[in-house]
Curated annotation (Swiss-Prot):
Complex and partners: Component of the ER-mitochondria encounter structure (ERMES) or MDM complex, composed of MMM1, MDM10, MDM12 and MDM34.
GO molecular function: lipid binding
Known role: Component of the ERMES/MDM complex, which serves as a molecular tether to connect the endoplasmic reticulum (ER) and mitochondria. Components of this complex are involved in the control of mitochondrial shape and protein biogenesis, and function in nonvesicular lipid trafficking between the ER and mitochondria. MDM34 is required for the interaction of the ER-resident membrane protein MMM1 and the outer mitochondrial membrane-resident beta-barrel protein MDM10.
Name listed for the protein in its UniProt record: Mitochondrial distribution and morphology protein 34
Entry annotated with the keyword Lyase: no
PTM: Ubiquitinated by a SCF (SKP1-CUL1-F-box protein) E3 ubiquitin-protein ligase complex containing the F-box protein MDM30. Ubiquitination is important for mitochondrial integrity.
Gene source species: Saccharomyces cerevisiae (strain AWRI1631)
Compositionally biased tracts (Basic and acidic residues): 338-347
Family: Belongs to the MDM34 family.
Residue numbers spanned by region Disordered: 338-375
Membrane topology listed for this record: Multi-pass membrane protein
């Protein structure tokens, strides 16, 4: 889908004059930061569009948008345009940052005056091709440039500065398409729609135009018909944000609320709510107890807090023993019911203490003596050193044996320990045992000289 401009509008010089004045107002806007190098305002001398621009509509969204809004994506092409700008610059670079520079860093020169140079910049053969997003509403048209391809020829009256200015202009050209041109097109469209039936020959001055931009009526910002275009989901989110200023929502205090909003508790009334909470400290702090007589009183005792968040008995109550177990049980039960209101199966964990009969002093003394005796008995057993030599019993050998060879291990098993072992006598499975060597002098005792099959190993 394509779009054609009216050739008669571009053929008339009035269009170029309007663009020139609008561009001069945008470049000299007071909202922009004025460069110190510029000694005067920027004046647009000439604007010319010999070739009619081309506009191609790539996408148009009208159905999904409200009736007062239209969105589209367009491609703009412009060729052979010309722009001439004139201004005055400061050539003495020492005076540019004179206000922000300390005096002791400035050199004392013989002639340190201002030296201004008038400069004229001409942009010719401008070729522009850009993809834009267009938003059309009743007051005007808004355009944002996304993809811009720009080429031009630059000519400066001061040739020594031409290369530097051209490089800086190309680097900062994105500011022109991001801020200057969109504001220029929007202001022009506003003036065009408001004065559609009237002549546009009279153009307001600089101050009047700036006042027209800054002063806006309240109906333009938010009209009554705009509420129908707002999404109900967004309205619900906005209402939740507004209601979030009241925090700490307590559903259990809807009837007896401490604030104007039912079900909510404001932070400035939080101490009042805590003071009404059932606790041991809040209950006993309301009663008056005699203060201890002491010469030195600390600052913490002089200043008594209005409430306490801990469920503890005050020290004065414990010292004076003016507490009641039934009252403490009632308060603790109320706290438990309040904390477990949603859980019916929860049971309180109570600490049970069994009280027995008091012991007589004689029983205590006898038990103490018995404990002492037990401790001494234990000490006598444990105090035996480990390295104490244990006397070994002599072996009871027959009197007719003179030379014996012991085959027992060097570790002697005590009789007490050996009795605990499960030693069952089984004579049928016992293997024959033989002594090796000369063990007897009398052959009548049936002692053998060794193994029957092999002689003893004599060396």
């Amino acid at each position: 889908m394509s779009f054609r401009f009216n050739e008669a509008v571009f053929g008339d010089n009035s269009f170029n004059e309007r663009v020139r004045e609008k561009l001069s107002t945008a470049l000299n806007s007071p909202s922009k930061k004025k460069l110190d190098i510029l000694k005067s305002g920027i004046k647009v001398q000439k604007v010319d569009f010999p070739t009619i621009p081309q506009l191609e509509i790539l996408d148009l969204d009208i159905i999904t948008q409200p009736k007062s809004l239209a969105k589209g994506i367009c491609k703009i092409s412009c060729k052979d345009a010309m722009l001439r700008i004139q201004t005055v610059i400061e050539s003495n670079l020492l005076l540019i940052n004179e206000q922000d520079t300390p005096s002791f860093t400035m050199p004392q020169l013989i002639n340190n005056g201002s030296f201004t140079i008038p400069i004229t910049m001409t942009f010719s053969s401008i070729e522009l091709e850009a993809i834009t997003n267009i938003f059309v509403k009743n007051p005007g048209i808004g355009i944002s440039f996304n993809d811009v391809d720009l080429d031009f020829k630059f000519d400066c009256s001061v040739k020594i500065l031409q290369s530097t200015i051209e490089r800086r202009l190309k680097e900062s050209m994105h500011v022109v398409f991001k801020d200057v041109l969109p504001s220029l097109i929007f202001n022009t469209s506003q003036n065009w729609f408001t004065n559609r039936g009237e002549s546009t020959s009279t153009i307001p001055g600089k101050r009047e135009h700036h006042h027209q931009q800054t002063t806006m009526s309240r109906n333009v910002i938010l009209d009554g018909s705009d509420f129908q275009e707002l999404s109900p989901i967004n309205m619900l989110r906005l209402s939740s944000i507004v209601s979030s200023r009241s925090t700490l929502s307590l559903h259990s205090t809807v009837m007896n609320s401490l604030s104007a909003i039912p079900g909510c508790l404001e932070r400035q009334n939080l101490y009042r709510f805590i003071s009404r909470m059932p606790s041991l400290n809040n209950y006993y702090s309301s009663q008056s107890f005699p203060q201890p007589k002491s010469s030195t009183v600390s600052s913490k005792q002089l200043v008594k807090p209005f409430y306490c968040s801990h469920n503890l008995l005050p020290k004065t109550v414990l010292d004076s023993s003016q507490y009641d177990l039934a009252t403490i049980t009632k308060i603790q039960s109320r706290l438990f019911d309040r904390s477990n209101s949603n859980d019916d199966n929860a049971k309180p964990r109570r600490r049970k203490i069994k009280c027995k009969k008091t012991r007589t002093p004689s029983n205590l003394q006898s038990q103490g003596e018995q404990a002492v005796d037990d401790s001494t008995a234990i000490e006598t057993v444990t105090s035996t050193p480990v390295q104490t030599p244990i006397p070994e019993l002599e072996e009871q050998s027959p009197p007719y044996l003179k030379t014996t060879v012991s085959i027992r291990d060097k570790y002697v098993i005590p009789e007490k320990i050996s009795l605990n072992l499960d030693s069952k006598k089984d004579t049928s499975k016992k293997k024959p045992f033989y002594f090796i060597g000369l063990n007897s002098q009398e052959p009548s005792n049936n002692w053998k000289w060794g193994m029957e099959d092999s002689p003893p190993p004599y060396h």
